[in-house]
Amino acid sequence: MIPLKAADIARIVGGELVHCDPQAKVTRPAEFDSRKAGPGSLFLALPGARVDGHDFIAKAISSGATLALAARDVGEPAVVLTPLGKQESNADAFAHDPRGEGAAVLRALGTLARFVVDTLAPGGLDVIGVTGSAGKTSTKDMLATILRAEGPTVAPEGSFNNEIGHPYTVLQADHDTKYLVAEMSARGVGHVAHLAEIAPPKVGAVLNVGTAHLGEFGSREVIAQAKGELVEALPSAAAGGVAVLNADDDLVAAMATRTSAKVVYFSAAGAAQADYRATDITLDDVARASFTLHTPSGQFPVALAVHGAHQVANALAAIAVAVELGVDTADVVAAISSHVAASRRRMEVQELPSGLVIINDSYNANPDSMRAGIDAMLRTATARSSAAWAVLGQMGELGAATEQEHHKLAEYLQESGVNNLVAVGESDGVRALADKALELGLNTFKASDTRAAADYVAAQVGSRDVVLVKASYADQLWQVADLLTAAQETVDDESEVDG
């Protein structure tokens, strides 16, 4: 973060400075976890489901934080903001904020983040926005790998992509930062536009329009309206703006009419009209893709170290952004080929000592990413001549389409040749999945929780089998992967003792 005096922060965000030396400086980025606050940091007093950040201001200050952004005076150094009242929004940040105290802090945080971007932009900071229904985090991670080889780069950890994580990430930029990669999510129309207002992007990539958050939006067309807000926020082509669009998705390709930026296309299907496309795609025995990359400057062989055929499209988007930013194509190819998964529980592939392979893709799930995970599992199982086990939870936020989409998932399992399903949990979606799978004749086990699922899988799988673990975040299905790994370690320890 760029150093700022307490008085300047109060002026920028329009709050009242209390119990603080006006000349005291914030020299480190913001923190909303008091345990991470340290000398020179800015503490964010945000309300949550179980605790209120205002109750932890004193702890943050005692740990060295310079001051807090707060919505009420608790007798500690702070910039105090006026509560905004209950917000009419489906954003997660406002779910436990009846008085609008968190909304006031977040508005101030966004204002401060915009000030930082405006301060750094004349010095050469390039902001890149990435959005889409699926693949945002993987693409963001790939792009960060490429750009870090070119200069100091700030990118969010994991999926810090909403009204909290986005400005939080922006404040990590300083005068040395050359690239700021912003992952932008949405649960409604206007959300991406809001994030783009905080950190106006020079280059924006839209990956796809799928069915994630379908229950919030109502239709794919409304999702496209929201995702396209990113390209609307780009500067003109004359001012250096570039929109990177997926030629294989009609709703994304149509966004070209919504921007005055330069438009370039990528295509994992090898569409001839795409500026960046892949042909000759092959997968190895753990579903890592190799392909021929076609670019405006020639053809290049690419071998990815991440898993899943769907990663080809993500890689193409990252490649296109980097090349359009001026990075040499050969350097881009070298960096993308060396990239390994940086965010946990996203296509993490682990082979246990017994030979069992666990594909942990449990961070989130929607119909598109479910199919991609199943495809990767099947590819790996086929290459190993082993059985495939789908350990699945619900796909959340599908609204009225919940039952239909989970029925379709069961049908996709059958069509793909997956015979073993462990359906975890008691949600409506999981029940619909299990009931349809049983109707279709799949070997289906209904597990009430992650422990029951792990115990069943451990007792049933063969030593070289492949297990996919995937569900929406709320299901915490990564516990199945953790339990299976721990069980294997226990067996190994006992074997060593017996030996």
What are these regions (language model features)?
Residues 9, 41, 60, 112, ...:
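Residue-level signal for inorganic ion chemistry
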Residues 1-129, 139, 149, 447-460:
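Short, basic phosphate-binding NTP loop
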Residues 57, 61-62, 196-197, 414:
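Non-catalytic positions within long, well-ordered alpha-helices that form the structural scaffold/packing
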Residues 94-247, 251-259, 459, 483-498:
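Phosphate-binding loop of NTP-binding sites
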Residues 74-77, 123, 205-357, 386, ...:
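Acidic, Mg2+-coordinating active-site environments of NTP-dependent enzymes
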Residues 1-20, 37-42, 52, 141, ...:
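ATP-dependent carboxylate-amine ligase
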Residues 151-158, 266, 443-446:
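Conserved RecA-like helicase motor-core motifs
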